[in-house]
C-alpha cells in the first residue's frame, strides 16, 4: 500500500514534518510493507515555508536585519538556485515576542524589506513569503521603510517605523525608494482574505489576539486607510491585503508582490499532483478541523487536489461540531487523535504519540477483510 501523508502543522505543538513522521510511524506499526511518502504542507499560515523547505530540500541561510524592536537580529531564509522562501513570523512572529512586550503598534517589520533587497542582490528571481502568525499591525509601513521610504510628522520630524507612527503621519518621501526589478516575482502565500481596512480588515480581525486594545481599533484602522489613500489606493481593495497585520498590503504596494493561494502554491511547489497520481490513500490533517477549514485551509486544499477515486482521510487534533456530515470536500473520514479528557497542555505535549496510535488504528482497519 502506498500512502501520501500531507498534513499541516498542529499549532503550538508539532510542525507539519513532525506530524507526518508520527503518522508514518503509526502506519508502519500496523501495515506490512507500507510505503509512506511524506508531503508536509501549509496554507500560508505560520509553518508553511518550513513545510515547503522540507519537501524541496532547500538550503537554509541567514541574514542580519533590523529586529522587531530596532535591534539587529538574524533571520532565516531558504534558497535553491534562483528561488527563495521565508516566513515573516521568523522575525516578528507572536512566538518571538515576550508577552510583556506585545504591542502590535510598536513592533518593527523593516527587516523584511531589508531581506528582500538582499535576496534580489543575490540574483534571486522568485521569492515566496509566508505572512501568517505575526505580532505586528503596522499596515505595511515597515516593509516600505526597508525599501527606502521615509515618513514624517507635521513638523517634518522623521517618524519611527512602526504602526504607532501611522497615527501621526503627515508626509511620505520616496526619494530613496528601492525599485523592484521587473524580472523579480514576489508572491505572498496567504490563508486569509481579509482586506487592509474595515471591520473585516487587519486591525478588527487580528488586533485583539496581538494585544491591541479594542479602544484603539477605530483610530488605527482609519490611520491605515489614510496612509494607503496617500500611497496606493488600489491596495485598499485587495483581498488578503490585511494578512500579517497589513504586511501583505505593504508587499503589494511597495514591492509589487502578488497574493496567491497559500495551499495551492504550496502544492504546486512540491509537485503534489505527480506524487499523488498513483497512491492508494491520502492522509490530511491539522490541529483543529472546523467549518473555517473549508475556506482555503490545507486539508481541504489537499483533498480537492487528490484524484477522484483515491480516498482521503483526515487525522486531526480535534473535530468541531460545526463540520458538515462526512464525506465532504473529498474527505471520506475524519479522526480526532484525542484519547482521553485531559488538560490542553498535556494533549499538546502528547500529540506525537496520539498521532501514532491513531494512524496505527486506521492501519488495522485497512487490514480488515471486507465485510
Swiss-Prot record:
Cystine crosslinks: none
Residues forming coiled coils: none
Catalytic activity: (R)-glycerate + ATP = (2R)-3-phosphoglycerate + ADP + H(+)
InterPro entries noted in UniProt: Glyc_kinase_flavodox-like_fold (IPR018193), Glycerate_kinase (IPR004381), Glycerate_kinase_RE-like (IPR018197), Glycerate_kinase_sf (IPR036129)
Keywords for the protein's UniProt record, in alphabetical order: ATP-binding, Kinase, Nucleotide-binding, Transferase
Family annotation (NCBIfam families): glycerate kinase (TIGR00045)
The protein, known as: Glycerate kinase
Organism (species): Neisseria meningitidis serogroup B (strain ATCC BAA-335 / MC58)
